[in-house]
């Protein structure tokens, strides 16, 4: 009797964990937040005095510990929840018109 109860509880826990993982996976796919990383086309290097060469524009130098070279990357976080849902009329008004 105890073995059957223990086996039933194990199965119930496995099912609960599976449902939780499925829900977490679908929730992660529906997040309306976007983090983008773009390569700026240049690299950065550590100078003999310990400082790093500058990156162009809004790019920053990212490097591994102990390495003397890195990549110039631009990072941006966009939260799409701050934008309202547009109506059809607003979409039509924002559509470019041919000349």
From Swiss-Prot:
Glycosylation site list: 43, 49, 58, 85
GO cellular component entries: extracellular region
Residues spanning the signal sequence: 1-28
MF GO annotations: C-X-C chemokine binding
Keyword line: Disulfide bond, Glycoprotein, Secreted, Signal
Main location: secreted
Subcellular location: Secreted
Disulphide connectivity of cysteines: 40-59, 44-61, 55-72
Known function: Salivary chemokine-binding protein which binds to host chemokines CXCL1, CXCL2, CXCL3, CXCL5 and CXCL8.
Protein name, entry field: Evasin P1162
């Amino acid at each position: 009797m105890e073995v059957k109860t223990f086996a039933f509880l194990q199965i119930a826990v496995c099912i609960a964990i599976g449902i939780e993982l499925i829900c977490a996976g679908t929730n992660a796919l529906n997040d309306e937040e976007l983090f983008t990383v773009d390569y700026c086309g240049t690299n950065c290097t550590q100078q003999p005095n310990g400082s790093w060469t500058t990156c162009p524009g809004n790019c920053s130098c990212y490097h591994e510990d102990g390495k003397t070279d890195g990549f110039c990357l631009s990072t941006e976080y966009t939260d799409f929840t701050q934008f309202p849902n547009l109506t059809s009329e607003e979409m039509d008004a924002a559509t470019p018109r041919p000349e």
